[in-house]
Amino acid sequence: MANNKSAKKRIKVAERNRLVNKSYKSTVKTLTKKTLANCEKYKLDPNSDNKNLVMFSLSEAFSLIDKAVKKNVLHKNNGANKKSKINKLVKNFLTSK
């Protein structure tokens, strides 16, 4: 257990940061799943509305990943890998008929 004031403060700050980071990571996972669900929807009914929905959710996911990297929640390589993986899956869905 921490004995001095600065150590106690660091514990509080670390816990606060952990919760914020957890929130970012959870939201990234949610938006990734949402994007893939929209891809499935597009695959079943390929029309321009569904394609726009896929592109919008993809841009939302990319934006949040970039923000997480900027705030050091994710490492830049990890963020790039996540974006690449999502983009590869979306590209496969959009090109396969």
Swiss-Prot record:
One of its GO terms (biological process) is translation. One of its GO terms (cellular component) is small ribosomal subunit. Keywords: Ribonucleoprotein, Ribosomal protein, RNA-binding, rRNA-binding. InterPro entries: Ribosomal_bS20 (IPR002583), Ribosomal_bS20_sf (IPR036510). One of its GO terms (molecular function) is structural constituent of ribosome. NCBIfam families: S20. Belongs to the bacterial ribosomal protein bS20 family. This is Small ribosomal subunit protein bS20. It comes from Prochlorococcus marinus (strain MIT 9515).
